[in-house]
Swiss-Prot record:
The keyword Ribosomal protein does not apply. Interacts (via its ubiquitin-like domain) with CDC48 (via N-terminus). Associates with the 26S proteasome. Specifically interacts with the regulatory particle (RP) subunit RPN2. Exposure to arsenite, a known inducer of protein misfolding resulting in accumulation of polyubiquitinated conjugates, enhances the association with the proteoasome. Binds to ubiquitinated proteins conjugated to a 4 or more molecule ubiquitin chain. Binding to ubiquitinated proteins is zinc-dependent. It is found in: Cytoplasm; Nucleus. Pfam families: UBL_ZFAND1, zf-AN1. Present with 4280 molecules/cell in log phase SD medium. It comes from the Eukaryota. This is CDC48-associated ubiquitin-like/zinc finger protein 1. Zn(2+) 2 binds at residues 31, 34, 48, 50. Induction: By transcriptional activator RPN4. The modification Phosphoserine is found at residue 273. It comes from Saccharomyces cerevisiae (strain ATCC 204508 / S288c). Residues 170-266 are annotated as: Ubiquitin-like.
Amino acid sequence: MSAAIEKETGMLDVGKHCAYCRQLDFLPFHCSFCNEDFCSNHRLKEDHHCRWLLEHEEVHKTEKSPSKSRDGSSSNDEAYFKSLLPERASVRIQRVSETREPLRGSNTAKVSSTLNSKTLDKIFKFFQRNEKRKSNNKSKKNFGSSSNKIIQLANLKKIAKGDPKIPMQNRIYIWCYLVDGDETDIAKEDTRMPLYINKMWPVGRAMDYLSIQLNVKSSTLTNSSSNDKFQLCKLKEGKQVSFYNIGASLRVTNEIKDLDTLYLVHNNADEKSN
């Protein structure tokens, strides 16, 4: 009797039940990852939530989590791979500006040390006298806004003097004072000259050009270059009144911009020796 039942059961043993939904399927699919049989609806690993996927996901999470070293510090693989990727343009530009700023600060500190006490005294006396004259002129308008700066630049272009051979796109329009320290010729020092120079020039060449435009006596430039006879100074930005010397080897395009006020300070023989 039992043999007959076994034989009958064997005859009916066609197809297999799906391990996921228990539905009988005559063409079952065998999953080699979890070693189970599934119907056509659950033949994929994702469809029957294969154990291999779950185990693989746990291993992946373990590998991805930060591992702690002996000293307790954690090493993040994700941070390491991000460091290998190029940074965004905005981040790169910000980092370049941050690295350039200290360079300019260190350069300014070095240049400031080249202004000896007599030169500083000369330019400060000139500046104080000039500011006092401005404060007495109460009717003078304030041109501090950006819109007024545009008007100022347009007016400066109309009266500025310079070499007509300089291309229009290379011209930088400035105001320039000659600071000589000669008390007998204060009117000449108080004259602010509207000029334009070439932004492609070295500062040393601009100093030569400015000394000629400011009608410096020819005897001043004999037996020596204007770089030795003069220092080109500029007022630092900020509330505190402070000047720095623009080095002759620097470029105009990097140091001078439109509407800047420059001070061409004459060095006497005894000042150079200090």
